[in-house]
Structures are given as structure tokens and as C-alpha cells.
A protein has these predicted regions:
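Formylglycine-dependent sulfatase
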Residues: 21-23, 39-209
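Bacterial Sec-dependent N-terminal signal peptides
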Residues: 1-50
Length: 209
């Protein structure tokens, strides 16, 4: 994942990836306090006269941290980094923010829900793929008992309480939209189960899907 905004390069070294998103993205969006979003899932719109930088966020499936010419471990290229030539990614990293310490779940839905909500998987409780309404996607096992999880995914706070096994949130794109941004989603969403509002990126604050 590459996160870009601003006009100068900033290297972030922090174990809490989501705290970094709160601190830098939401501060630039003019939203405060950050703890309100993280703790309750609701944020009030705050106006600001400061200029707003463009924000581009990439979530890339199955891309290793050494699969580009941009070093993500530290500022030095590894031997694997040197195998690749990705000058556009180098430029994006130079102009934006490069996270050098982060955590992502092993499958896509929990990570996507974390990016939208600012919560880790233990908080939003989406720990596997979301798919059909009210249906788990767990593999069956006679040995291991699997914990209950939110298989209906994340949902916009406008439908809070309507769906079982779901977490209602004010999504990051909605916060940005409320503060003057035009928001675009491209590609896979996989936030909520099919036939729920959370399955449609437009309900999460994206102007264009």
C-alpha cells in the first residue's frame, strides 16, 4: 500500500498503522478530534480555511514489501528492491508519505475494513472474507471452534443496528467528502456482504465508484 499527500516526503516509523492514518489524513482533512472517530465511529464536520492537498491511496493485493524499487524497510534498497524499476512509485513516495512499519491482515476484507474504519480487525471484528448476507465464509472444522465475527462486514452509520454481525461506521471517504473532498473509488471494495449498503462504495462516501 502506498499513501501519498502533501508536497514533501515524510518517512513514518510507527507500529500503529491506524494511528498514523488518523493523525495525518484526518488532520489534513480538518477533522477533530481524532479520538472521536477511532472510539465511536462518528465524526462531526469541521470547516477549515487551510489548503487541502490531494490524497491518493493504493491498497495492493499480494505485493511484497520488497517488490518495488522503493525501500519500505528503511531508506536503503535491498537486493530484491534492486531487481525492480518502478520510477513512478519512487516519485510518489518522494512526494508523499511512506509507511515503513505497518500491519495488514492476511486476507483482503479485514484490511479494507480497517482502512475504511480506522479500527483494527479485533475492533471491527471482520476477520474473514465478507460475501453473502448472514453467511459465514469460515472453513468447517471438527477440531477448532471459530469465534463469532462480523461476517456482514462494515456498514454506514445510517443503518446502524439494522444488520446483525456488522459494524456501523463513519467511513474515511465520508469524512473527507464532508470536508470538501471529491472522492473516487476504483477496483475491488469488499467492505460489506452482498445486498447490504456496505457492499456499495457509494454508501461509504465515495462520489464515484
Amino acid at each position: 500500500m502506498v499513501l501519498i499527500f502533501g508536497e514533501k516526503a515524510i518517512t513514518l516509523e510507527h507500529n500503529d498503522f491506524f494511528t498514523m492514518i488518523h493523525k495525518y489524513l484526518l488532520t489534513l482533512a480538518g477533522v477533530a478530534p481524532l479520538a472521536t472517530w477511532a472510539g465511536t465511529g462518528k465524526v462531526q464536520t469541521v470547516t477549515t480555511n487551510e489548503s487541502r492537498p490531494n490524497i491518493i491511496m493504493f491498497l495492493v493485493d499480494d505485493m511484497g514489501w520488497q517488490d518495488t524499487s522503493v525501500p519500505f524497510y528503511n531508506n536503503q534498497q535491498s537486493k530484491l528492491n534492486q531487481r525492480f524499476r518502478t520510477p513512478n512509485m519512487e516519485r510518489l513516495a518522494q512526494l508523499g508519505v511512506r509507511f515503513t512499519e505497518a500491519y495488514a491482515c492476511a486476507i483482503s476484507s479485514p484490511t479494507r475494513c480497517s482502512l475504511m474504519s480506522g479500527m483494527n480487525a479485533s475492533r471491527h471484528r471482520v476477520t474473514n472474507w465478507t460475501l453473502e448476507l448472514d453467511q459465514k465464509t469460515d472453513a468447517s472444522s471438527e477440531v477448532i471452534g471459530l469465534p463469532e465475527w462480523n461476517y456482514n462486514g462494515i456498514q454506514p452509520d445510517s443503518v446502524a443496528g439494522k444488520y446483525n454481525n456488522a459494524t456501523a461506521i463513519t467511513a474515511l471517504p465520508q469524512i473527507l467528502k464532508n470536508n470538501g473532498y471529491f472522492t473516487i473509488h476504483c477496483g475491488k471494495a469488499h467492505f460489506g456482504a452482498r445486498n447490504t449498503p456496505g457492499a456499495d462504495p457509494a454508501t461509504m462516501g465515495f462520489d464515484v465508484n
